[in-house]
Amino acid sequence: MMYHIPGVLSPQDVARFREHLEQAEWVDGRVTTGAQGAQVKNNQQVDTRSALYAALQNEVLNAVNQHALFFAAALPRTLSTPLFNRYQNNETYGFHVDGAVRSHPQNGCMRTDLSATLFLSDPESYDGGELVVNDTFGQHRVKLPAGDLVLYPSSSLHCVTPVTRGVRVASFMWIQSMIRDDKKRAMLFELDNNIQSLKSHYGESEEILSLLNLYHNLLREWSEI
């Protein structure tokens, strides 16, 4: 399933990120890509050796960790170190699949269950640059407001279309979920959403407590910690 997570960064945070990123050192985006991806990748990424990068990636991690909807949809166990990319002058990233396992600075390695893109450019400021994701439900074309995030299975083929005007800047990362199976994770997310909706309409009740108990028992049964 694909999820739109709005308001991960406020407009003020986005403006500050953009100001800092204009001062950043950018390198060829292929430095973080395997052999297959390097053949179709043409973009730039912030140099991960800089102090500015270290500060910005930490802010992204803090923002997603504090976002309740992101947590409910992803049920994250491990988050990769966020990266930052930039597309301009017809730069693009052709169809590719993300690697199943990535190195992780604390855990040694992590499984990539979910991929996330946090948009940092207003959609009106550039042409093209759509994230295109192919999954079992068809093809999805994504171009979200700055500060919003899209979450989708890392197993999906995806691409970024050429940016023909302006500049598209984003942060991206991978998530190892406590729930490996996409369908089980989607069921838990739907159950959680319905529990929260019932609580907001009717307050606490024995029935809602029973549903909450069911949610946590399923999470206990399915989670990998």
UniProtKB/Swiss-Prot annotation:
<dbReference type="Pfam" id="PF18331">
    <property type="entry name" value="PKHD_C"/>
</dbReference>
<dbReference type="InterPro" id="IPR041097">
    <property type="entry name" value="PKHD_C"/>
</dbReference>
<keyword id="KW-0847">Vitamin C</keyword>
<feature type="binding site">
    <location>
        <position position="158"/>
    </location>
    <ligand>
        <name>Fe cation</name>
    </ligand>
</feature>
<dbReference type="GO" id="GO:0016706">
    <property type="term" value="F:2-oxoglutarate-dependent dioxygenase activity"/>
</dbReference>
<feature type="binding site">
    <location>
        <position position="168"/>
    </location>
    <ligand>
        <name>2-oxoglutarate</name>
    </ligand>
</feature>
<feature type="binding site">
    <location>
        <position position="98"/>
    </location>
    <ligand>
        <name>Fe cation</name>
    </ligand>
</feature>
<feature type="domain" description="Fe2OG dioxygenase">
    <location>
        <begin position="78"/>
        <end position="177"/>
    </location>
</feature>
<dbReference type="GO" id="GO:0031418">
    <property type="term" value="F:L-ascorbic acid binding"/>
</dbReference>
<keyword id="KW-0223">Dioxygenase</keyword>
<dbReference type="GO" id="GO:0006879">
    <property type="term" value="P:intracellular iron ion homeostasis"/>
</dbReference>
<dbReference type="InterPro" id="IPR023550">
    <property type="entry name" value="PKHD_hydroxylase"/>
</dbReference>
<keyword id="KW-0479">Metal-binding</keyword>
<keyword id="KW-0408">Iron</keyword>
<dbReference type="GO" id="GO:0005506">
    <property type="term" value="F:iron ion binding"/>
</dbReference>
<dbReference type="InterPro" id="IPR044862">
    <property type="entry name" value="Pro_4_hyd_alph_FE2OG_OXY"/>
</dbReference>
<dbReference type="GO" id="GO:0006974">
    <property type="term" value="P:DNA damage response"/>
</dbReference>
<keyword id="KW-0560">Oxidoreductase</keyword>
<dbReference type="Pfam" id="PF13640">
    <property type="entry name" value="2OG-FeII_Oxy_3"/>
</dbReference>
<feature type="binding site">
    <location>
        <position position="96"/>
    </location>
    <ligand>
        <name>Fe cation</name>
    </ligand>
</feature>
<dbReference type="InterPro" id="IPR005123">
    <property type="entry name" value="Oxoglu/Fe-dep_dioxygenase_dom"/>
</dbReference>
<dbReference type="InterPro" id="IPR006620">
    <property type="entry name" value="Pro_4_hyd_alph"/>
</dbReference>
<protein>
    <recommendedName>
        <fullName>PKHD-type hydroxylase YbiX</fullName>
        <ecNumber>1.14.11.-</ecNumber>
    </recommendedName>
</protein>
